[in-house]
Amino acid sequence: MKKEHIFVIILVVLIAGITTLAVVSNQKNNVDKNPVLSLALDKTAQCLVDGGAKFYGASWCSHCANQKALFKKSVKTLPYIECSTGGPGTPQTQVCIDAKIQSYPTWRFTDNTELSGEVSPLDLANKVSCSLDDTSIAELQIQKDELIAKQKSTQATQKSQSTTQD
């Protein structure tokens, strides 16, 4: 009887592991399955470079990692400037001190305006007047809507946790 239970447990764990692997693999390949989004992100990243935008962040910053993830494979084109000399609490790099960067991520534009926090690629494209076709705009809008839903979900979870702790 115990051998049967062990076999069932092993089988369940194996199936769960395979399912998890399939889901993660599908998420990583998602951009390849949507070439329109991939091209829109490529164009947006290049527009940011051409428009003189600067993306200040820190290697240890989770919001910076999320910002980069929004650009998928186009992340390598972003005008990224590393501000951290190490982990949290370490001094900023001189370029970020000179730029007076106070939070991460921070996007700075040639008109001396800035946006802080996770910003959708669509909002960044609009900020630098990037010319995108309607299909690209639609794909970036879907991505933005997903980002907003994720942020609202995170805020609701945090609010629920703080209420529970009170």
Summary of predicted features, one role per range:
Residues M1-K33, D166:
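N-terminal targeting signals for export/organelle localization
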Residues K33-P79:
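Local sequence-structure signature of Cys/Sec-based thiol-disulfide redox active-site neighborhoods
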Residues C47, T85-V95:
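Structural microenvironment flanking redox-active thiols in thiol-disulfide oxidoreductases
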Residues K54-G57, P79-E82, T106-R108, E114:
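Structural recognition of the beta-strand scaffold that forms the well-ordered cores
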Residues S59-C64, S84-G87, Q102-S103, T113-L115, ...:
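Solvent-exposed loop/turn segments at secondary-structure junctions
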Residues T93-T110:
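Structural micro-motif
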Residues R108-Q151, A156, S160:
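Non-catalytic, surface beta->alpha helical segment in thiol-disulfide oxidoreductase systems
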